[in-house]
């Protein structure tokens, strides 16, 4: 396992939680939407605009000053917000004039992205910023043993965060996810009804939410992206491609999550002689398919042995390096994948006709030189009015962002309820009780 540190702090959850077991009721469906509840609206306004005064919060949320005051007081008492008296306007009288901001230092959430080859464990603050990431090979054994191994890795990682309280765990992965129970069918890993949520909830003693990785990435665009979405936002199509392909819809400020799980575009019919495949999208544009074509074309000597031992990321990096060095075959191969992807995005756009099209995943972001081919194929393949494609704001960190937002979604939808479920609110009340009696 190796670590990519984003902060010099080495912090961990509160001690004493390691052996605390939670029943399966601590598996919670993710809330991948912009909540319009008063507390959520106020917290979102402060998160996006803070430090900010209560009058500005009222103006941006359309809530009354009285409602804003009540919510701010509750969030201050819960420790999610803090006052900035040093920023108060000169001459202002009374606490409602004191700006507030998110009190992010005391808390952390844990995101886990279980990929086909690599699992990322991500520490996230209340702004949705990645504090630190570690990566470990995804266990290839049966679901029970694999989940036990992943839970042990996550538990060891949480022990680093001694000065912050862990609030929630968000898990993202491919396959068919039952978010209500946290069980997953993942054919590529050989998992059938794998109890992902229950195992992690029991092992970590924290609430756990499990989501389809593409739904989660779309949720990150909606809730953590640089753009300011409103709860009544229009429709966006999110298309993902890397080792797998997938799509998600954002409708009215909410990621559309069908009860039976996300749809699939893996068997979408495509054609590419250079990439081969079975005439289906995923088997044609996945990293594995591109590397298989590179082996056939003898672009990179020795690429076969590395990919068979799980080094596909390294092999793709080698292919990109060769293309950037001027190898014409490598450039044509990556351009062909871009062409096929652009045509597939055009087909989805014409079928669903969203107001916005967003693409993400390393098939789009690791080689931005090919985005011109993606856009050209998209324009040529669509029969509707011209529309731009927007690339994810998270670049090659989109999997981290997806896992992070699933770990934060409960807090963003119901800040006080999330603290209560995690046990943090009760602990804070116990900590402050002696002060109140003094």
Curated annotation (Swiss-Prot):
Disruption phenotype: Disruption of the gene reduces the expression of PE13 and PPE18. It allows mice to survive for significant longer, with substantially reduced lung pathology.
Listed GO MF terms: DNA binding
Amino acid composition bias (Polar residues), ranges on this chain: 1-12
Disordered, as annotated region: 1-22
DNA bind region: 52-73
SS bonds (residue pairs): none
Keyword Transferase: no
UniProt record, GO biological process: regulation of gene expression
Keywords, comma-separated and alphabetical: Activator, DNA-binding, Repressor, Transcription, Transcription regulation
Described function: Positively regulates the expression of PE13 and PPE18. Can also regulate expression of some other genes. Plays a role in modulation of innate immune responses.
PANTHER family, per database record: BIFUNCTIONAL UDP-N-ACETYLGLUCOSAMINE 2-EPIMERASE_N-ACETYLMANNOSAMINE KINASE, ROK (REPRESSOR, ORF, KINASE) FAMILY
Family: Belongs to the ROK (NagC/XylR) family.
Protein name: Transcriptional regulator Rv0485
